[in-house]
Amino acid sequence: MTFSKQLFPFVFFLLFLVSLRHASNPNNCSSSSSRPLRCGPLEVPIRFPFCNHARFNLHCTDLNKTVLELPMSGTFLVRDIDYRRQKIYINDPNCLAKRLLTFNISGSPFSPHFDILYTFLSCPNEVVLPSWYPSIPCLSNSTSSFFATSNYSLAQSMLPSCQIVKRLHVPATSPFGETRFSSDLNNQSLLLEWALPDCRAKCLGATKKTGTIYNSNIFSCSFSFLYDSRELFINGNLSSGVLVLVISLSAVTVFVFPTCIAIRLYDSERFDSAIAAATVMQQPREVMARRGLDQSTIETFKKMELGESRRLSGTNGIVCPICLSEYASKETVRFIPECDHCFHVECIDVWLKIHGSCPLCRNSCA
């Protein structure tokens, strides 16, 4: 019998007692017992579930700014977090409109609170437009100007002089769309919410920090899930907490010890071999999930050299959704099978070698 098997019941028992101790301590969940974590003096407080939770990726930048990392869209500046309503406001001060063209919250625990459908257009600069049609400066260039509106009728009225680049859903802060072109899209925040884990039924305080938060490290703080302290100390009644503790210790004696003895008698070789087999079976799936396409497969996708008109089939616009540059004549574009979305060859080839799916609709190309 190995030393680890002999040690396991003792460690299990200690962890159980420690859990009871933290569950019966009402100060562990008190937001006033310690100062909340922050990236900087004026930044938002960091509390559960943004403390040491795998899917809530909150970081500090070198400038002590709080940023949220979304798996499919990158990092965004955090403007505010409403813990009671479980909402977070994010923004990109550089060019939010550009980030929206490829915005995707797949793989994250967040969802839009208000979902507004916006239309993005590109108009040649030689087209004379009214002065009250504000363009988006960070997307515009010397040859064309970009516009955005949630009024689709207004967008259609600008055709055929202008081209619709993309229509997409924006997680807005208000359920009401605009009747004109958006003049401050870059100054707005995106409003996201999360349903699980539900922090509203728990206290909001974080009790412990490891690492140095002001050196751009990831947050790590503890939070007790085992019990709510209010269940153990109702109206200051200490006897109920003691009663729960006594019952729990009795349960340890009756149920936990026999279980530990059974585990110690379990065949270690069968246990280890089962774990090894599970590990071997799991590794190929993880590798395959991260694998892109090889060049020979990518070359089988249809290519086309653009003519002077630069016209493309289907819903494809005149702008490459990856690099956001307008297509030029004599350039070569590649089409994705099934969805028929197209991109610059040099843009989509690099993407497919990493992701193996369409950047717009996420359909698998394998």
Swiss-Prot record:
The EC number(s) this enzyme carries: 2.3.2.27
Listed transmembrane segments: 243-263
Compartments where found: Membrane
Gene Ontology biological-process annotations: protein ubiquitination
InterPro entries named in the record: ATL20-22-like, WAK_GUB, Znf_RING, Znf_RING/FYVE/PHD
GO MF annotation terms: polysaccharide binding; transferase activity; zinc ion binding
Pfam families on file: GUB_WAK_bind, zf-RING_2
Pathway stated in the Swiss-Prot or TrEMBL entry: Protein modification; protein ubiquitination
GO terms for cellular component: membrane
Record-linked Gene3D superfamilies: Zinc/RING finger domain, C3HC4 (zinc finger) (3.30.40.10)
Keywords: Membrane, Metal-binding, Signal, Transferase, Transmembrane, Transmembrane helix, Ubl conjugation pathway, Zinc, Zinc-finger
Span of the signal peptide: 1-23
Zinc finger intervals, RING-type: 320-362
Catalytic function, reaction form: S-ubiquitinyl-[E2 ubiquitin-conjugating enzyme]-L-cysteine + [acceptor protein]-L-lysine = [E2 ubiquitin-conjugating enzyme]-L-cysteine + N(6)-ubiquitinyl-[acceptor protein]-L-lysine
Bilayer disposition of the protein: Single-pass membrane protein
Domain of life according to the entry: Eukaryota
Domain remarks: The RING-type zinc finger domain mediates binding to an E2 ubiquitin-conjugating enzyme.
UniProt similarity note: Belongs to the RING-type zinc finger family. ATL subfamily.
Protein name stated in the entry: Putative RING-H2 finger protein ATL21C
Species this chain originates from: Arabidopsis thaliana (Mouse-ear cress)
Annotated gene: ATL21C
